[in-house]
UniProtKB/Swiss-Prot annotation:
It catalyses: 5-oxo-L-proline + ATP + 2 H2O = L-glutamate + ADP + phosphate + H(+). InterPro entries: Glyco_hydro/deAcase_b/a-brl (IPR011330), LamB/YcsF/PxpA-like (IPR005501). This is 5-oxoprolinase subunit A. PANTHER family: 5-OXOPROLINASE SUBUNIT A, UNCHARACTERIZED PROTEIN YBGL-RELATED. It is an enzyme of class 3 (hydrolase). The keyword Hydrolase applies. Its EC number is 3.5.2.9. One of its GO terms (biological process) is carbohydrate metabolic process.
Length: 255
């Protein structure tokens, strides 16, 4: 039987600003990526997100970002190796404080937004993130784009790596994600997205935006929780995976 993790980026409200349907989404995923304050999230939101994750038996992961609240972490920044490492460590530490207080552990770490996209192609940046994780806790799984520079960096730092694929994003011919700024970057057809997910899991392939067949590995599927259809979408994905006899379970159970 195929096994796959279903993850979502949550805990992205802060202050008076509310985002997503975290309480509902957490009923359907196996892992959650928790914003750590640099692109979204705040101490109270982190606390509540972990409470909800614990109630639903969902594993937690740190979701570090560039320091970019105004741009939601989606703007690229030129930072040094040490800055990248320290920003990641700082955010890991923030999540760890809440996790420890609640008797929980950090299962994985997944970079957010522009930091994620840059680390997928810049091995030096990926190495900085992996060094931060390895120095913090070598048992934490590094979650990143399938067949990217992050995979190689994790190997070099002795970390377990989970290959992530996206249900609602289009791919370039080189396996990177199509920029959100471009037409066709987001897949709005739920049935098409589900078919693509099943193909990625069972055949280890996806069709790029230009029609090219790309090889990849699907350990974890990301379903975004920041749009109006997110809840129905994640419900349908879970239902269809079960129909295909694909077991949904957290990364720690098979990576």
């Amino acid at each position: 039987m195929f096994k796959v993790d279903l993850n979502s980026d949550l805990g992205e409200s802060f202050g008076a600003y509310k985002m997503g349907m975290d309480e509902e989404i957490l009923k359907f995923v196996s892992s959650v990526n928790v914003a750590c304050g640099f692109h979204a999230g705040d101490p109270c939101v982190m606390d509540e997100t972990l409470n909800l994750a614990k109630q639903n038996g969902v594993c937690i992961g740190a979701h570090p970002s560039y320091p970019d609240l105004l741009g939601f972490g989606r703007r690229n920044m030129q930072i040094s190796f040490e800055e990248a490492k320290n920003y990641a460590l700082y955010q890991l530490g923030a999540l760890f404080g809440f996790a420890k207080a609640k008797g929980m552990k950090i299962q994985h770490c997944k970079a957010h937004g522009a930091l994620y996209n840059m680390a997928a192609i810049d091995e030096n940046l990926a190495l900085a993130l992996c060094e931060a994780v390895a120095s913090f806790d070598e048992n934490i799984i590094f979650l990143g784009l399938s067949n990217s520079a992050m995979n190689e960096a994790a190997k070099k730092k002795g970390l377990r790596y989970a290959n992530e694929v996206f249900a609602d994003r289009a791919y370039n011919d080189d396996g990177t994600l199509v920029s959100r700024k471009l037409e066709g970057a987001l897949i709005h057809d739920e049935n098409l997205a589900i078919k693509r997910v099943i193909k990625m899991i069972k055949e280890s392939k996806v069709t790029s935006i230009n029609g090219k067949e790309i090889d990849l590995k699907a350990d974890s599927i990301c379903v975004h929780g920041d749009n109006a259809k997110a809840l129905e979408f994640v419900k349908k994905i879970k239902e269809n995976l079960k129909k295909e006899q694909i077991q949904i379970c957290a990364l720690e159970n098979f990576i």
